[in-house]
Amino acid sequence: MCSWRCAAARSHASANRCTPKERLGRQENRSAHCPGTIRSIRMEWSRWERQEFRCKRSFQRLGSSCEQFSPPMQNRRWEIERLPWRFSPVGKPFHFRDNVRAMRYVELHCRSNFSFLDGASHPDELVQRAAELGYEGLAITDRESIAGVVRGFSPAQELGLQYIVGTEVHPTDAPPMVLWPTDRAAYGRMCRMLSTGRMRCEKGRCELSFEDIAEHAQGILAGVIATDESRSIEDQHAHVNDSRQFLRGPFRDVFDDRGYLLASFHRGVDDAAKATWLRNLSLATDVPLLACGDVRYHSAERMALHDCVVAISQGKSVEQIQSDRLVNSQHHLRSLEEIAELYRDVPDAVARTIEVAQRCTFTLDQLKYEYPVELAPEGMTPIEHLKRLTWEGARGRWPNGVPEKVIETLRHEVTLIEDLQYEAYFLTVWDLVRFARSQEILCQGRGSAANSVVCYCLGITSVDPTHTDLLFERFISRERGEAPDIDVDFEHQRREEVLQYLYEKYGRDRAGMTAVVTCYRAKSAIREVGKALAISPDIIDAVAKLAGSYSRNPELPERCRDAGLDPDTPLGRRFLYLTETLIGFPRHLSQHVGGMVMTAGSLCELCVTENAAMPGRSVIQWNKDDLDDIGILKVDILALGMLSAIRRCFELVKDHHNRELSLSTIPPDDTPTYDMICAADTMGVFQIESRAQMSMLPRLKPRCYYDLVIEVAIVRPGPIQGNMVHPFLAARENPAAAKYPNDAIRKVLEKTLGVPIFQEQAMKLAVVAAGFTPGEADQLRRAMAAWRRPGVIDRFRTKLLEGMKANGLNGEFAENVFRQIRGFGEYGFPESHAASFALLVYASCYLKRHYPTAFCAALLDSQPMGFYAPAQLIRDAQQHGVQVLPVDINDSNIRSKLIPDLNRPHPKLRLGLQMVRGLPSAVAQKIIVARDANGPFANLHDLTTRAKLSRSNIATLADADALASIAQDRRAAVWQSLAQDDSGDSMPLLADLEPDCSVPEELVPMSPAEEVKNDYATTGLSLKAHPVSFWRDDLNALRCKRASDLPKLRDGVHVRVAGLVLMRQRPGTAKGITFVTMEDETGSMNLVLFAQVWKRFFKIARGSDAWIVDGKLENKKGVIHVIVGRVEDLSEKASGLKVPRRDFR
C-alpha cells in the first residue's frame, strides 16, 4: 500500500516544480514510514515507456534513477510530473496485480441519471457503490449540468468518500472533455460557463465553444475525451493528426499543467490498439494520461436500463439505436482488481487520479450564500432598517399600545434574526408584499412564518401569533441549522406581475426560479418503456390505464396480464424490471411553481442557470431540497386560486351589491355562515370542500374561528395516523372528560381538549414534559419523518421517555404521547399554517353563503382550481337558488357576469365565452370589441364580418350552442357556419353579399340527449339536462335509487345507485380504501370502496366513467356514504360523453 501512497500522494497544486533528485528524496522520506519498504528505492519503468524511449536515449532497465534520465525533449514538464515508476524492494520486481489492495483510485468521470436519459443510476447509488469498492473519491460529471451533484454530497460525507463536482462538456469546435474545478472561484467560473451555454439556447440544450471554455478555464482541470468508441481504431487513427494538433496547441495553451488525456478501457476487442494509440498521442503531445471509467451506471445490471433511456431520448426502440448503444456493460463502477488489470501497462494513469483528486479542494459546503442587501436605505444597515419597519408595523397592529408580551417577543425574534443574519431575507419578502399591495394584488403569508410576530408586524402574515400562542422556533431556531422558509400566496392570475417585479429589480443575473425535477411516475414509465421495447401500443395503453399514476404498484404484473402482456415471458420480465427501475428517475427539469432565489452577487456563479420554458424567466438547476441541503434561502411566491376567486368575488359584490369587502372587514362571527359549514354545505370553498372534510364538519360542528383552525388541521394524515381524530371528537362531545397530568401539559393541550392536533403542540410537549429545548423539539419533529429508518428515532424516544419520567409522568402516558408524535411524521399540520388557511376558509364560506352568484362566477373565472369541475360548481349554485344562463354570443362577456333580477334574491349568472373549449381568448376579445362598438349581431354573416372570425371560429361557437340568439338551432348553426367565408374582409368588393345560409329541410334538429352530449363536449357541462336523466327509466327498472332518495333511507339498508363518476381519491393513509364521488340528475353520492372490492372490480373501477353500484348505506349524523360491494359498468350508455373528472391521491 505504501508504494502506491508514496507514488500518488504528491501535491500537484503547487506551481513550483522540483528536480527529479528532490522528488526522489521526498519519496525516500515517505518510504521511511511505510512498512515493507527500504530507503534505497529503485524504479522500474513500464514496458511501453522503455520501448518508447529506447531510440531516444539509452538507459538502464532496472536501477536507473531519475537523475540519470533526461529525455531529449525541450519541454520536460510532463516527464517530470508523471508517475511512470513503481516502487519495490531491491531485488524483488513489483507486479501491479500483486499489490491491488494497496491501490488507490478515484473515479473522475461519472454520468448519473441527472444527465437526463443518458445515465442509469442515481447519484447516491454511485456514491454508495464507490465506497463499497474501496474508491477514495468519486466525481459526478453530468453532461453540461450540475443538477444532480447535491444528491450525492451528503451520502459521500456520511461514507467518508471524497466528493468531486465536475461536468462533461461537448464544445462545438473541440473534442468533448471533462472539467473539475479546483476551488470555489473555479467552481463559480464553471457554473457561469455552463450558464452561458444554456442561456443562448432553448430550454434543455447547451452550446459551448472552446473559446467559452478558455475564458473560464482559470483554476479548472480538464481531461480530453480523445476517442470515440463508436469508431474503429483505424478511423481513430485517421483523426490522430487533428487530436495532436488540438492537444499540442489550444488545449496546452489554455490548461498547461492542468490538462490531461482521458484513458478509458471497457474490455473491447481493440483495447490493446486503443492503449497504444493513447500512449502515442500522450507522448507526442506531452499531455499525461488519466484513468477514467466513463461511468454511466453503478452496476452492470443497469446496462439494459441505459439502453432503454437512450432509446427514450431518441424516440426510438432499443433495437433501432444499435449504433448508439454501449458496446458492453463495462461502463459501471468496477472493482480495484478489474482496474488494476485494465491499466496494468499504464499504472501511472491510475495513480494520477489521486493527484487530480488532491488538486480538487472545492466542496459544496464552501458555497456561502449572500442575500441582496440593497433594500436598506442609504446610511442604514439591513438590520437597522428591519428593526425600524418592525416597530412601525407593531404600532400599526396595536394602535393603543404594543403589549409588553409582544415587545418581549419582538426583541427575542429580532435578536435571533440578527444573530443568524437573516435580516436581508425578511426585507426581501416584505418588499414583495409591499409591491403586491401597491398593485392591489391579494396576498397572504402562511406556513411556519405565521409563527413570527416580526412577519405579522411587517404585514407578511395576517394571523397574530400571540393570540394563538404559536411557537417561533417552529420557524427559526439556532439548533435547526437551516434557513427559514416564508411562503406567500398571491392571486394565481396576477402572480406573474410579482415575479417580473423581481426580475426587473435584481436582473436575471441575480434572480432565478427554483427547479422542479420532473420524475417518471408509474404511468409515464410504463408508456416510455413500452415504446422502447416496441410492445404493441394497444397493450401499453391498456396497462397504463389500469396501473396507478404515481408510485410503484405491486399489482403491476397482474395488470400486465389483464392487458395481454404475460409477465412471465422474457419480454414481460424485462418490461417489469425496466418500468420498476425507471419510476423515480429524473425526466427533465421544470420550474417550481413559485420558489425564487435572489443573490447579492451573480446567481450563475452559485448554480447553473438556464432559460425556463416561459419567456422572460430563468431557472436554476437545483430544486428546493437541494437548496435546503446547502443552506440557500429562497422565497416561495406561490399562486393560490382561492385568492383570485376571493378578489374577483369582492369586485362583483362591489359592482352589483354596492358593498366593499376585504379580508379584514368580513363580519367575523356570522351565524348563517357557520350554520352552512356545520351542514357540510361547502362545495367550492377553500380547504374544507373535500370528501373527508365534508364528512368531518357535521361531527366537529365548527362555531368559531379556532374551530376552523382545528378542522383544517385534523383531516390530515398525521392526526389520522397518530389516532387523534376519534379521541378529539369524543372529547368534543364531553369536554369535561379531558385529563391533564399537570398544569404545564394542560396549557399545551387544553385548547385541543387534551389531544395534540398540531406540530407545535408536539414540540411543546417535548419541551414542557421531557425537558427538550425548543430547538431540540424541532429536531424531534423532523426526525419523525424518518421513524422507519432504524436508529433515527430511538435516541429521541429514549430522551423523551426519560425526561417525562424525571418530571413524574407515568410510562403509559409517555408512550402514548410518543405514539401520537410519531404519527405526525411530515404529515402533521402546523398550527400557524392552519391558522392562515382558516382565514380564507371563513372568507370563502361567508361569500358563498351571502353572495352565491358572485361566488360561483368568481370560481368559474379562476379555474382551474379546487376539487370540483365547473359542472359541479354550477349545479351547486343552482341548488342555492342561482339561475344560470348559457353562453350567448350577444350577451356573454369573456368572463362570467351577473345580471340583476328583481324577482329573485340573487342575480342571474351568464356564462362567459371562456367556457367554450377551443375558442382562443383573442377571438373572444374581438367579439366583445365588435359588439360593444356597433351593438348585437344580427346573424352569422354580421358576426363573421364585424368580428373578422374564421370559419373554424364560427364552427366552434356553433358547436357550443353559443349562436342560439342568431341561428335557428344548434345543427342549423353548424350548417350555416360552413357557408361563411373563411375571412371576414378578404373579398371587399363582395362584402355586402351574404352567403347562402339556407338550411336543408332534411336537416333534423338534435334530440335532447344529443344536445346534452354536445354541451359536455364543448363546455364540459349542460344546463339543459343531466345525462343520467335519459337513462332513468332503465335505472328504475333495475331498482336504482336517486341521490336525493338516500337521506330519507335508514342506516344499514342495501341500496343500488347509478351515475357518472366525477372523482376518485385514494389517500396514502386510507389503507387501500378508495373514495369515489358519483353524480346523477338529483345530486352527488359518496361511495367507499375497500381494497378487496377495488381489486375485484379493478377494470371497471379504474376505467369506466359510469357505474351501477350495490352496497350498504351509512347514514349517521347527516353524513351519508354507500359502502360498495359490487360495481357494474354503465359506460355503454355514456358512450361518447366527455365527463369532466378529477382523480386525486
Swiss-Prot record:
Annotated catalysed reactions: DNA(n) + a 2'-deoxyribonucleoside 5'-triphosphate = DNA(n+1) + diphosphate
GO biological process, one term: DNA repair
InterPro entries assigned: DNA_pol3_alpha_NTPase_dom (IPR011708), DNA_pol3_finger (IPR040982), DnaE2 (IPR023073), DnaE2/DnaE/PolC (IPR004805), DNAPol_HHH (IPR029460), NA-bd_OB_tRNA (IPR004365), PHP_dom (IPR004013), Pol/His_phosphatase_N (IPR003141)
Cytoplasm as UniProt keyword: yes
GO cellular component: cytoplasm
UniProt KW keywords: Cytoplasm, DNA damage, DNA repair, DNA replication, DNA-directed DNA polymerase, Nucleotidyltransferase, Transferase
Subcellular location per the Swiss-Prot or TrEMBL entry: Cytoplasm
CDD domains documented for this protein: DnaE_OBF, PHP_PolIIIA_DnaE2
This enzyme's EC code(s): 2.7.7.7
Broad class of the protein's primary localization: cytoplasm
Protein family: Belongs to the DNA polymerase type-C family. DnaE2 subfamily.
Name of this chain's protein: Error-prone DNA polymerase
Species of origin: Rhodopirellula baltica (strain DSM 10527 / NCIMB 13988 / SH1)
